[in-house]
């Protein structure tokens, strides 16, 4: 019996690996937690809140986007990020499927 719902897409093995690698970095995890604490989070605010250079923040945002964990929206000259909850849910479900015995 599948526990996946219509709003919870399956991740390909490559997507699962990208998410796992993205979440393994403590700085990316901290950035993701900050973004998740608000509906949207401005890139400029991330640069103020975290003791990281703009280039480092940009690199980590690109990795999180490549993994599908966040999406961006440009408003004028400002970039805003938000969590893609459906990807986190799919990753969590796949992780449970892989590591927890269900019988």
Residue ranges and their predicted role:
Residues 48, 65-66:
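Alpha-helical residues within the helix-turn-helix
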Residues 32, 66-67:
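Extended rod-forming repeat segments used as scaffolds/tethers
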Residues 14-53, 75-87:
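N-terminal helix-turn-helix DNA-binding core of bacterial DNA-binding proteins
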Residues 61-62:
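Short, hydrophobic-biased segments on the C-terminal half of alpha helices
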């Amino acid at each position: 019996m599948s526990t996946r719902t219509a709003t919870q897409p399956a991740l390909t093995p490559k997507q699962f690996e990208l998410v796992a690698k993205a979440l393994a970095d403590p700085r990316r995890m901290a950035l993701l937690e900050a973004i998740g604490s608000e509906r949207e989070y401005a890139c400029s605010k991330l640069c103020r809140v975290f003791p990281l250079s703009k280039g480092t923040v940009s690199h980590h945002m690109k990795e999180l986007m490549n993994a599908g964990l966040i999406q961006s929206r440009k408003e004028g000259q400002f970039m805003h990020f938000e969590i893609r909850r459906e990807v986190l849910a799919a990753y969590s479900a796949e992780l449970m499927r892989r590591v927890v015995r269900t019988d």
